[in-house]
């Protein structure tokens, strides 16, 4: 009779999963033993890095990623990264080894007490099988739960003595199961949307990350061009759903209630696609919408639809809805919006570069299809203004604001997109949350470029301290970190740029390299 171990690997294989992202402990060794030759194991040195790498891989590949963590402690280390995955609808299958069944009740060392509850509410589904024979069925359920819209992480705890037990003899029925979450568009909803857009005198469009996840970017461009409507990206955007040099593009929305209502004032119909309404950040009280503005959102997530504080919501397949709207709305006789002017160059300070210059240089030198990961949070506005992001899957950011995402996620994105150059732009404060992911990049020779914006301070916190009128706050500076030394210690080539000439030379060298490169750039803080 087939074992749980062999049956589970065959299930993963038949479902198109051949990569395990992990950091093993003793509870995980029975699962990893006799590791199949047609699988690959991507090791990271800490669990937040494991989940970050897998998250990047899942988002870029648009496929579920399989993760193996160490019991409760490893799961706990991964929770911050899991919050980003939950908010980005990343299809992650997170497994964790559990103590042997005979020892769970006495809570022996490495017991995951109440395992199914540990990762909630950051997972769609969480479970520990009641018996060893049930493990393949639970794994199949996890795969399909993670993959169905809205996608998201799931969690499965497996006692380590289960792997050598006999599987249910009917587990083979699970191997080739296909579960579809396709939903036919509601004609009534479509009719309401099309009529609202056709009759609008001044419509506006707001796009979110699920547009990019659904690869619906081109349809949204067509929709904007037919409506001659301005397009904003929803606040706190973790992906880029629209070309940033398109005439209709108006940039990244602010993250305050009053600021958004002021921005949308005068637009009689606002269509939001693939974004929560809205992911606010700083407290900026005011009207959600000005009088005369009607908002309709299209989302794949019922939770997002239910919690929106205003407007109507339609839960639907993002790709299908974007395509239908693009083909059904009437061509407007309005003039196409005038493209926003490209920002002017910035004068340089001696010994340090302005962030604007770094982004201008990246924009000039990087390949047109480059992929950017951003965790230089104090310079996000400058990045959106200056990078010409043309293609789907060109930008990723921590969806829950949890730092430590970009460095490992860039490695996962590069694994999923080997033909495109991945460039992670990371603040010196952010980089330290997951710096050990550099080791993984070096060991697997993953040719990601890491640009560390070193200004010696938590710039985003300094900005927020001003918003909150919080003076004399300690712990906002992070001096004395040698990122080149850290990179070299993990086996990554490291370069330095204190001026524009050095930056250009370092980028040229990094773009020609066959492995990972870190460039430490001395920058001026945008916040004093």
From Swiss-Prot:
- Gene Ontology BP annotations: mandelate catabolic process
The record's listing under InterPro entries reads: DHS-like_NAD/FAD-binding_dom, THDP-binding, Thiamin_PyroP_enz_cen_dom, Thiamin_PyroP_enz_TPP-bd_dom, TPP-bd_CS, TPP_enz, TPP_enzyme_TPP-bd
Identify the EC number(s).
Answer: 4.1.1.7
Instruction: Report the superkingdom from the record.
Output: Bacteria
| Cofactor info, note text | Binds 1 Ca(2+) ion per subunit. Binds 1 thiamine pyrophosphate per subunit.
One MF term in GO for this entry? benzoylformate decarboxylase activity
Cofactor dependence is on:
Ca(2+); thiamine diphosphate; Mg(2+)
Q: Which SUPFAM superfamilies match?
A: DHS-like NAD/FAD-binding domain, Thiamin diphosphate-binding fold (THDP-binding)
Family named by the database record: Belongs to the TPP enzyme family.
State what protein this is by name: Benzoylformate decarboxylase
From which organism does this entry originate?
Pseudomonas putida (Arthrobacter siderocapsulatus)
The protein's gene is named mdlC
């Amino acid at each position: 009779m087939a074992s749980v171990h062999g049956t589970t690997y065959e299930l993963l294989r038949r479902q198109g999963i051949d990569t395990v992202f992990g950091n093993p402990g003793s509870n995980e060794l029975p699962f990893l033993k006799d590791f199949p030759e047609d699988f690959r194991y991507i090791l990271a040195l800490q669990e937040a890095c494991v989940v970050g790498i897998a998250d990047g891989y899942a988002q870029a590949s648009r496929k579920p990623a399989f993760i193996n963590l160490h019991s409760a402690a490893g799961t706990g280390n991964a929770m911050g990264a899991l919050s980003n995955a939950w908010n980005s609808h990343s299809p992650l299958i997170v497994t964790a080894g559990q103590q042997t069944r005979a020892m769970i009740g006495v809570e022996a060392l490495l017991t995951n007490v109440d395992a199914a509850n540990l990762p909630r509410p950051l997972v769609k589904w969480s479970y520990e099988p009641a018996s060893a024979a049930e493990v393949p069925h639970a794994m199949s359920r996890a795969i399909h739960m993670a993959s169905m819209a809205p996608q998201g992480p799931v969690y499965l705890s497996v006692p380590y003595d289960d792997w050598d037990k006999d599987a249910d003899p009917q587990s083979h029925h699970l191997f080739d199961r296909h579960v579809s979450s396709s939903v036919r568009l509601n004609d009534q909803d479509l009719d309401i949307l099309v009529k609202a857009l056709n009759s609008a005198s001044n419509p506006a469009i707001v796009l979110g990350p699920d547009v990019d996840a659904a690869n619906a970017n081109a349809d949204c461009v067509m929709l904007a061009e037919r409506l001659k409507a301005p397009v904003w990206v929803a606040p706190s955007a973790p992906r880029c759903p629209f070309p940033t040099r398109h005439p209709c593009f108006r940039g990244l929305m602010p993250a305050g209630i009053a600021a958004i209502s002021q921005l949308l004032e005068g637009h009689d119909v606002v269509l939001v696609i693939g974004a929560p309404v809205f992911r606010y950040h700083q407290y900026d009280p005011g009207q959600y919408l000005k009088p005369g503005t009607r908002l309709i959102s299209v989302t794949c997530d019922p939770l997002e639809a239910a919690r929106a504080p205003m407007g109507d919501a339609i839960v639907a397949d993002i790709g299908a809805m974007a395509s239908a709207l693009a083909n059904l709305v009437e061509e407007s006789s309005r003039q196409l919006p005038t493209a926003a002017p490209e920002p002017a160059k910035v004068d340089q300070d001696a010994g340090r570069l302005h962030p604007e210059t770094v982004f201008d240089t990246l924009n000039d030198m990087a390949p047109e299809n480059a992929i950017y990961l951003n965790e230089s949070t104090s310079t996000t506005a400058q990045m959106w203004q200056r990078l010409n992001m043309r293609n789907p899957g060109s930008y990723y950011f921590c969806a829950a604001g949890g730092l430590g995402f970009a460095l490992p996620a860039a490695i996962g994105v590069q694994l999923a997109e080997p033909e495109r150059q991945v460039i992670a732009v990371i603040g010196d404060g952010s980089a330290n949350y997951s710096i050990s992911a550099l080791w993984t990049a070096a060991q697997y020779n993953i040719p990601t470029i890491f640009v560390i914006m070193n200004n010696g301070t938590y710039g985003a916190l300094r900005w927020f301290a001003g918003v909150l009128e919080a003076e004399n706050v300690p712990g906002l500076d992070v001096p004395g970190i040698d990122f080149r030394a850290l990179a070299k210690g993990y086996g990554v080539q490291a370069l330095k740029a204190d001026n524009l000439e050095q930056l250009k030379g370092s980028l040229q060298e990094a773009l020609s390299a066959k492995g990972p490169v870190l460039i430490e750039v001395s920058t001026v803080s945008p916040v004093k």
